[in-house]
Amino acid sequence: MDAAFAAIPTEDISESIQNNIVVILQGLEKKIAINRQINQNLEAVIADVMDYKFLSNAETLPKRFIGDIASIKAGGDCPQEWSKYKTKDCQIPIYSNGTDNEGLYGYTKEPTILKRGITVAARGTIGYCTMRNGGYVPIIRLLAVTPNDIGGDVYLHQIFNRIKFRNDGSIQQQLTVPSLASIEIPYPNASTLKAFANITYPLIEKIKQNKIQIEELTKQRNELLPLLMNGQVSVNSDLADD
């Protein structure tokens, strides 16, 4: 934000307005940083619960192949009808193998994956994984993993974060559906996973809401800066104190 502050044409506005602009922008930045820190803490709690409940006694859990406990689908081409930004007609997120903005590529009309699960990057940053709500479209060979059990999405996400994925040995390095499906992991029973979901789903929902607020605050910050610079809106320093 220092660069943004420096870009404000201070010679054209009064010192008091300059100060208020800085206060507002710094307030928005502070809120964004706090939400990010809260999310990091919540993610750490989920990882700790995973370690305590399962990985501390992983040797006692049954071993299962990922292909037996979840469906795995590789994303295809981008839908013909899509938009880079959310529109009235295009509300369904499209995800690719990228890591920027958690792989969000754009939006389309109809989902191909209906249930909550995890996506795993099959190219580039192989193994980068993110939890997804149901109703999305994976593209460009991104692997969509949909667990059979409630709570399986959180469990597999934690497992994937701890796996060092290997590519399939081809010239173009990639992770394939068969290679992911053939990985054997410790896997608890359905009732234990459901209890795990009861603990972690509220935390995941809080993380989701914080991400939404971060997006809104970032948009507000980015829209507010040029308006303030051009004198098109009045300054209200109370925004920074909410």
Model-found features: residue ranges?
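DNA target-recognition domains and sequence-specific DNA-contacting regions of bacterial/archaeal
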Residues: 1-12, 64-188, 239-242
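Non-catalytic DNA-recognition/assembly elements of restriction-modification systems
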Residues: 2, 7-100, 186-236
